[in-house]
Amino acid sequence: MAKAKFQRTKPHVNIGTLGHVDHGKTTLTAAISKVLADKYPSATNVQRDFASIDSAPEERQRGITINISHVEYETPKRHYAHVDAPGHADYIKNMITGAAQMDGAILVVAATDGPMAQTREHVLLAKQVGVPYLLVALNKSDMVDDEEILELVELEVRELLSSQDYLGDDAPVVRVSGLKALEGDEKWVQSVLDLMEAVDNNIPDPVRDKDKPFLMPVEDVFTITGRGTVVTGRAERGTLAVNSEVEIVGIRPTQKTTVTGIEMFHKQLDEAWAGENCGLLLRGTKREDVERGQVVVKPGSVTPHTSFEGTAYILSKDEGGRNNPIYTNYRPQFYFRTTDVTGVISLTEGTEMVMPGDTTDMTVELIQPIAMEEGLGFAIREGGRTVGAGKVTKIIN
C-alpha cells in the first residue's frame, strides 16, 4: 500500500519536556496527547498513552525514562513533534541529543517539590545546547492547597530561568495536573489546553535554516529489506529533494551516495526541510557503511576535522560536574551532535588548570574526524556524565 503524503498545512514546531525525574514529564506528555485528541480529533491527534511514550523495556523496570520518545500532535495553530526528554541524571546524554532538537521546551516542575538538582541541570544544558525558549508547567498543582506555596515555587522557578539568561520574569508558568487531566477532570483538562495555548503563543514560529546547505546528523541506521539502508535524524539546515546526491562525512572517509526516498512519521516526502525528523533511503549504501555520529550533507559543504580551538564551561560539583580541576592532556569524550569522540585537551599557555565552575579556552585533538564548523556546540563527558559544555571557536585541522 502506498504511504500517505505528509501535508504541510501549519507551522511545524519541535518541542519537548525537560525536568527532574518523577516530576511527571511523561504523564504530562500523555495528558497533552489525550486532551488534544479529545478536543481536536484529527489523523495527527491520536492519543498516546503513558506506557507507549515510556516505551523502552529497561525503562519500566527502573521506573525511569531512558530513551527519547517522539509524539506527534497538533493545535488549531500548529503541528508539533514532541520529544519526551529523559530526566534521570545518568541519561543526560540523551537529554543532549533531545534538547538539541527543540525550538522550545516545557520545563516540568512538581509543585510539591519545586526545582531540584536535575531541574537546574536541564535548564543549564538547555541553554548550552541552544534551546531558545522555555516555559513552565507547574505539575501536580492539584496536590498543593496552599496558594502561598504555589507562588513561592513559581518565584523559585523564575529565578532559576533568569540565572541562565532565560526570560524568567516573562516566561509563562502554568499550573497543571497531568494525572488529573488524564483522568478527565475538567478543571485540569482546561489547564493542559491553557498550557498548549501558552506554547502556541510564547514559542515563536521557528526560523528554519532552509537557505543553508543541507545537513542532517545521523541518529540511527537500519535496513529495509528489498529497499536498502535508511538513516534517520533531524535535518539541521537546508532542504533535500529526493534523488539528490549527498556526502556522508565524519568518523570514516567521506563517501558519496544518492537519496532515493524521504519519509517523516511514516509518510513520504518529496523533500526534507530543516527542522524535520526524517528517514533518508540511501542508494547502494550498506548498513555497515554508515554509523551514528556521521552527517549527511550537500556535497562539498562540510569537511571533517580532528583539531580545533574551543571555549567551554566546566560544570561545578553542585551542577553534577567534577570534584577536581582539569589539566592539559585530560582525555574526556567530546559529544558532537549525536556521538562521543575521545579528545585530548591542551589548555592555553599560562593556564595550569581549570577549576569546576570556570569557563576556559582550550585546544582539542580528537582521535576521529568529525564534521565540524565554527560555532558547533559540544558537551564534555566523562564516565557517562556531562562535565562541561562548549563551542568550537576555530578549526585548526
From Swiss-Prot:
Ranges in a coiled coil: none
Superkingdom as given in the UniProt entry: Bacteria
Ranges for domain tr-type G: 10-207
Alphabetic keyword roster: Cytoplasm, Elongation factor, GTP-binding, Hydrolase, Magnesium, Metal-binding, Nucleotide-binding, Protein biosynthesis
GO CC annotation: cytosol
HAMAP family: EF_Tu_B
Listed name of the protein: Elongation factor Tu
Source organism of the structure: Leifsonia xyli subsp. xyli (strain CTCB07)
Lineage: Bacteria, Bacillati, Actinomycetota, Actinomycetes, Micrococcales
Gene behind this protein: tuf
